[in-house]
A protein has these predicted regions:
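N-terminal secretory signal peptides that target proteins for export/translocation
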Residues: 1-2
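Bacterial N-terminal signal peptides
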Residues: 6-16
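Short loop/turn motifs that connect adjacent beta-strands in outer-membrane beta-barrel proteins
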Residues: 21-26, 53-61, 87-91, 115-121, ...
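Gram-negative/organellar outer-membrane beta-barrel architecture
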Residues: 24-29, 35-204, 370-371, 377-392
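Residues that define the transmembrane beta-barrel architecture of outer-membrane proteins
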Residues: 25-27, 39-43, 74-78, 102-106, ...
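C-terminal outer-membrane beta-barrel translocator/porin domains of Gram-negative envelope proteins
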Residues: 195-205, 209-334, 386
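Small/polar (Gly/Ser/Thr/Ala-rich) solvent-exposed segments
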Residues: 336-344
């Protein structure tokens, strides 16, 4: 879930858990603020309607959250959000959004990640987006901040994954995807257009492809990212065929993350990420990248792009104190972190390693809501990320 909306939904759930049995439907008018490096600050208001479950008032059945916001580049944006929680590990959500300047979005997901052994799982994604905040610095690990350019990206993707639980922790699956991308010549004020600064960048003419692959997941974290302890790993590989703008493309990805309880006030967390892309005439937006609120904080989104990428990261999550208001339990924390990583293509994967350091100011609302303000430095200025959820 992106910044702004996510952070506000955290506040909604905080308020909603205070007296869940008072009414089946509760209303919360909330202010809205988000900031990420590529987009700047966004301000607005979001009325939220939360409906409690029919059989258990302590559980949320649905959340409806329309909003109106303003950003200096996108103008006024109207957004409709609906989240439906069907049962444990099964939900769907729909987002519709339009701005007075360029931006449009349709986003639907359905997730059935039940943990029952020998049961089928299903994940569906349909997304269409036009957004003016994309940046491009060129290819390779040695691009400099001064090489920044701007473009608008129009893309559509539809994907599905069907899995089978070998055990409650181990799932194997197959997935398929159809996607199309079209970079457009709409640059942010003060930045050169990517089409002018990088006229030979692969993929500027647009591309479409279909692909299919295999995926294996192992996860002992009973509450996902919010578990006190556990280990998760995922391996995937797919092969795609270009419809237009690209030949063939292969993508291989591996991730691993671990959560370790050290003391009552301290939790350790670490992650490893790797992606390798192979193929002919692969567009830059289909290659491996680092930078953003999840991978390599300290750099803006997609700061480095190439055919391969890796990153390692570790956090120490310190609980400063705990509050109890209206039956809501919240941990207030400061979580310092360090990271190292690199994109690579023609160069060796260890030839131009970069690092970043930072700290997260976080509020964890039991059992599974976290709002964070992460501050990170990687040699190109201090970056701030106001978002919901752990980076891993």
């Amino acid at each position: 879930m992106r910044a702004g909306a996510g952070g506000l939904l955290a506040a909604v759930c905080l308020a909603a858990t205070a007296h869940p049995a008072v009414a089946k439907t509760r209303f919360f008018p909330l202010p809205m603020y988000t900031t990420v490096p590529n987009e700047g600050s966004t301000y607005g208001a979001m009325p939220v309607f939360m409906v409690a479950s029919d059989d258990d008032p302590d559980k949320v059945k649905s959340i409806t959250a329309p909003s109106v916001s303003w950003n200096s580049s996108a103008g006024v944006t109207g957004t409709f959000r609906y989240y439906r929680y069907l049962e444990m590990f099964r939900s769907w959500h729909l987002l519709l959004s339009a701005s007075t300047t360029i931006n449009r979005s349709v986003w639907f997901t359905y997730d059935d990640d039940r943990r029952t052994p020998r049961a089928l799982t299903l994940n569906i994604l349909v997304r269409m987006r036009r957004n003016l905040f994309y940046r491009y610095w060129g290819l390779g690990p040695n691009t400099v901040p001064e090489s920044e350019s701007s473009y608008t990206r129009l893309f559509a993707v539809a994907s599905a994954r069907v899995g089978w639980n070998v055990t409650s922790d181990f799932n194997v699956g197959v997935y398929g995807e159809v996607r199309g991308d079209s970079p457009e010549r709409h640059a942010l004020e003060g930045l050169p257009a990517t089409q002018d600064l990088y006229p030979d960048a692969p993929g500027l003419g647009g591309a479409a492809l279909v692909r299919a692959g295999l995926n294996v997941r192992y996860d002992t974290r009973l509450q996902g990212d919010y578990s006190p302890a556990g280990f998760a790993a995922e391996l995937s590989g797919d092969v795609g065929h270009g419809i237009t703008g690209v030949g063939w493309i292969g993508q291989f990805t591996g991730t691993a993350r671990v959560l370790v309880p050290e003391f009552s006030f301290l939790q350790g967390a670490a992650r490893f990420y790797w992606m390798q892309v192979v193929g002919n005439d692969v567009p830059f937006y289909d290659r491996a990248s680092l930078g953003g609120e999840v991978l390599f904080r300290g750099f803006p989104e997609n700061r480095f792009i190439d055919m391969g990428a890796w990153q390692v990261e570790a956090e120490q999550r310190f609980k400063l104190f705990q509050t109890h208001f209206f039956g809501v339990v919240a941990d207030w924390r400061i979580d310092p972190f360090v990271a190292a990583g690199q994109v690579y293509g023609q160069t060796a994967p260890w030839e131009h390693v970069r690092g970043s350091v930072g700290a997260g100011l976080r509020m964890f609302i039991h059992p599974d809501i976290l709002g964070r303000i992460d501050l990170a430095y990687a040699g190109e200025g201090l970056r701030a990320y106001v978002v919901l959820g752990y980076p891993y």
